[in-house]
């Protein structure tokens, strides 16, 4: 027999699919209400009916496709170079002194493109996955793994939204909003006619009226959520980074990864315009290292700690992290001049001083 702990875990995994099932049932009912009750049973004009059905099915297809991709795209995990080797794990286990353990981790980290730190200035280490976290990577407690460029864990897709599927998530929000707006707009006149008793009471009345209320309500909530994530894309921030700015060697910098709105957009949607509206992976980079452009200190951000050289904080000439050769897709983002609005900026040094390293879950 399976252990009781395993059965309990499996039960919880099943419960995680309830929000997805709820969304699926709502969408399935909306399809029946719109196609059958509105278009087939209520609308009499053949031209109007045909146009509505064509546009509706196009939006429905793109919505389902992007939702599927968001749910079933496996989150990307850090490359093996960031994991501790078997030998390094044994060395850490044998060492009792913290300084000795830090030396081991320091040796591993010095050749990796890791430039973000914990709030205390230590290199970010996950003691559950036994790895040094790449920039923008976080450990998801729900998935129990480290996720590259983690944005958030979304219960409505039962998946982590991160580097592997953030574009799909954005398209899911966009097509969901368009779907709801289209249903609301085309259903409105028949909703009004049923409301004012302009049409006879039939089985379609309930479906058409409730469809209008549901679609309009979802439109409002989706509009706010989509607008927020559009803002995040333009700023090149994740939801986690919006709540807590990433920390670099010089301190926290909420604009540390921003390259300008257009380049930030390309990081998520890619260089190929033909793929921008399709839920096909086209994001730039590998999810482990990101180009960055440091900007002037934000007065709302904490000041540079005493004892640190203020010149380490760049006034912002475009400079990619890491100083090692970047992937071709990352290099393209940094071509053609500086980030918008950068003037008279000092160049940041490429030194990588040893820092205190601590574990971070």
Swiss-Prot record:
UniProt catalytic activity: L-cysteinyl-[protein] + hexadecanoyl-CoA = S-hexadecanoyl-L-cysteinyl-[protein] + CoA; L-cysteinyl-[protein] + tetradecanoyl-CoA = S-tetradecanoyl-L-cysteinyl-[protein] + CoA; L-cysteinyl-[protein] + octadecanoyl-CoA = S-octadecanoyl-L-cysteinyl-[protein] + CoA
Top-level class of the enzyme under EC nomenclature: transferase
Function recorded in the entry: Palmitoyltransferase that catalyzes the addition of palmitate onto various protein substrates and is involved in a variety of cellular processes. Has no stringent fatty acid selectivity and in addition to palmitate can also transfer onto target proteins myristate from tetradecanoyl-CoA and stearate from octadecanoyl-CoA.
Positions of region (Disordered): 299-361
Compositional bias ranges of the Pro residues kind: 299-308
Lumenal side: 37-50, 189-207
GO molecular function: protein-cysteine S-myristoyltransferase activity; protein-cysteine S-palmitoyltransferase activity; protein-cysteine S-stearoyltransferase activity
Subcellular location(s) per record: Endoplasmic reticulum membrane; Golgi apparatus membrane; Postsynaptic density; Postsynaptic recycling endosome membrane
Biological classification of the source: Eukaryota, Metazoa, Chordata, Craniata, Vertebrata
GO cellular component: endoplasmic reticulum; endoplasmic reticulum membrane; Golgi apparatus; Golgi membrane; plasma membrane; postsynaptic density; postsynaptic recycling endosome; postsynaptic recycling endosome membrane
Residue ranges that the UniProt entry lists as topological domain Cytoplasmic: 1-15, 72-167, 229-361
Biological source species: Danio rerio
Gene: zdhhc2
The protein, known as: Palmitoyltransferase ZDHHC2
Gene Ontology BP terms: peptidyl-L-cysteine S-palmitoylation; protein targeting to membrane; synapse assembly; synaptic vesicle maturation
DHHC domain mapped to chain residues: 124-174
């Amino acid at each position: 027999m399976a252990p009781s702990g395993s059965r309990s875990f499996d039960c919880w995994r099943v419960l995680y699919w309830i929000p997805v099932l709820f969304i699926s049932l709502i969408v399935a009912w909306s399809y029946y209400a719109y196609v059958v009750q509105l278009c087939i049973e209520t609308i009499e004009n053949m031209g109007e009916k045909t146009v509505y059905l064509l546009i509706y099915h196009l939006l429905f297809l793109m919505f389902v496709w992007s939702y599927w991709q968001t749910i079933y795209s496996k989150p990307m995990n850090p490359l093996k170079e960031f994991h501790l080797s078997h030998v390094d794990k044994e060395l850490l286990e044998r060492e009792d002194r913290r300084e000795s353990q830090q030396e081991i981790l320091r040796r591993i980290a010095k050749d990796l493109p890791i430039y973000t730190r914990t709030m205390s200035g230590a290199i970010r280490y996950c003691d559950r996955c036994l790895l040094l976290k790449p920039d923008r990577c976080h450990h998801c407690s729900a998935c129990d793994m480290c996720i590259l460029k983690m944005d958030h864990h979304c219960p409505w897709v039962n998946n982590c939204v991160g580097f592997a599927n953030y574009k799909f998530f954005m398209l899911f929000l966009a097509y969901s909003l368009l779907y709801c707006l289209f249903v609301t707009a085309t259903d409105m006149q028949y909703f009004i006619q049923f409301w004012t008793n302009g049409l006879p009471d039939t089985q379609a009345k309930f479906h058409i009226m409730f469809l209008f209320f549901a679609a309009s309500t979802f439109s409002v909530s989706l509009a706010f959520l989509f607008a927020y994530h559009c803002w995040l894309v333009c700023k090149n921030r994740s939801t986690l980074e919006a709540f807590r700015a990433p920390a670099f060697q010089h301190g926290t910098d909420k604009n540390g990864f921003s390259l300008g709105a257009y380049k930030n957009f390309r990081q998520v949607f890619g260089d190929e315009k033909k793929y921008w509206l399709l839920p096909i992976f086209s994001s730039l980079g590998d999810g482990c290292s990101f180009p960055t452009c440091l900007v002037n200190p934000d007065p709302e951000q904490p000041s540079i700690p005493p004892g640190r050289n203020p010149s380490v904080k760049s006034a912002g000439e475009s400079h990619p992290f890491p100083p090692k050769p970047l992937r071709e897709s990352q290099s393209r983002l940094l071509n053609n001049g500086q980030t918008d609005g950068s003037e008279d900026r000092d160049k940041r040094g490429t030194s990588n001083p040893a820092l205190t390293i601590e574990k971070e879950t």
